[in-house]
A protein has these predicted regions:
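Bacterial N-terminal signal peptides
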Residues: 6-16
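Conserved C-terminal helix/tail region of periplasmic/extracytoplasmic solute-binding proteins
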Residues: 299-332
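Short, glycine-/small- and polar/acidic-enriched structural segments
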Residues: 26-171, 178-188, 207
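Pocket-lining segment of extracytoplasmic ligand-binding domains
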Residues: 91, 98-99, 171-264
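Periplasmic-binding protein-like
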Residues: 116-125, 198-226, 237, 276-281, ...
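Positively charged n-region of N-terminal signal peptides that target proteins for export
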Residues: 1-5
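Bacterial signal peptide processing site
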Residues: 17-21
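Secondary-structure end/capping motifs
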Residues: 229-309
Length: 332
């Protein structure tokens, strides 16, 4: 065995020699690609169409191609996403625009980098038959109104239209009570309750909260200042924007995989939700400035509304709570 090994070694050495008996130069090894930068994106709900573009970016390898290893983490189950961001448990998290302003009032430092919805998906849902003509008419109507009374949007409506004349009942998260009462009104999120009604073939009319002027950015990706380098955020936003372009173009391509992550929501409901939310993402602003981009003037107006409603006492500068998005990809 020792002779065979020695002979093989000699043959290998001779074969490796070039002219003049000098060893041939081994070809230079190709540089190894840089390891992808990990990003932990914490959702504030379970996998659903309002996160579809992020999943599209993941499924299509857009994050990978941007030098990122993005982990999309579903709803923390009662945990506070802002606290998870502040503690470094996640690198970025999904919150609402009015939540960022309230946190700022309390000393928080979250900065918005990408907004999925250009117009808020929150509103009030009523039965289509004999429906009122406006959000104000709903607010001043009769019958039950199921809402989470502590939310800023309802405080704004009270400051804008006066106290509601409806009987306020707790919002339980389902639609059974709404279905049983033809005069009922209920808070809704455009991809949830209205999509459920579409699947069940129940005609409804949805009054968006923006009708009252209350139009916060929603499904907002926020970060702690300095926690993630700007070039990394830039690549994340660029990949996310492309993911959202693809999702809005063909949501049916991605919804089956999203539905597999969330069996509680049917594929039919996801497809209905995608169509319901499209007008709130594809707007004149986003067509001119890009999906995910935000207008500093909108942040200023939102802060002023929250002050008027008594939710916050002072309005921060827009530059302190949002980062202008540059979707020109930088090199990984």
């Amino acid at each position: 065995m020792g002779i065979r090994i020695a002979t093989f070694a000699l043959i290998t050495l001779l074969a490796a020699c070039g002219e003049g008996g000098k060893p041939a130069q081994a070809p230079a090894a190709a540089p190894s690609p840089a390891a992808p930068t990990p990003i932990r994106l914490q959702l504030n709900w379970v996998p659903e169409p309002e996160f579809g573009g992020f999943y599209a970016a993941q499924f299509d390898g857009l994050f990978r191609d941007a030098g990122l290893a993005v982990e999309i983490i579903k709803d923390p189950g009662g945990g506070s996403v802002p606290q998870l961001i502040a503690r470094g448990v996640c690198d970025a998290g999904v919150v609402s625009g009015d939540q960022i302003l309230q946190l700022r009032e309390q000393g928080g430092e979250l900065v918005a980098i990408y907004s999925v919805f250009d117009h808020t998906p929150y509103g009030v849902m009523v039965h289509a038959k004999d429906a009122p003509e406006s959000l104000e008419a709903v607010w001043k109507g009769t019958g039950n109104l199921a809402i989470e009374s502590g939310l800023p949007v309802w405080k704004w409506l009270a400051s804008r239209y006066g106290p509601t004349t409806r009987t306020v009942v707790p919002y339980g998260g389902g639609t059974a009570t709404f279905l049983a009462d033809p005069k009922a009104a209920s808070q809704c999120f455009i991809t949830a309750e209205p999509a459920t009604m579409d699947v069940q073939k129940v005609p409804v009319k949805v009054f968006n909260a923006s009708e009252s002027g209350y139009d916060p950015y929603t499904v907002v990706v926020a970060v702690k200042p300095g926690q993630v380098p700007d070039p990394v955020l830039q690549r994340f936003c660029a990949a996310s924007q492309e993911g959202w372009k693809r999702y809005l173009a063909t949501p049916s391509k991605y919804n089956p995989a999203i539905a597999a992550l969330n069996p509680a929501m049917s594929l039919e409901a996801m497809n209905a939700a995608a169509e319901r939310m499209r007008p709130l993402l594809d707007t004149p602003w986003t067509r001119a400035n890009g999906l995910g981009s935000m207008d500093p003037a909108r942040w200023k107006a939102m802060a002023e509304m929250l002050m008027q409603a008594g939710v916050i006492k002072s309005a921060p500068e827009s530059s302190a709570i949002m980062r202008p998005m540059d979707t020109t990809p930088s090199k990984p």
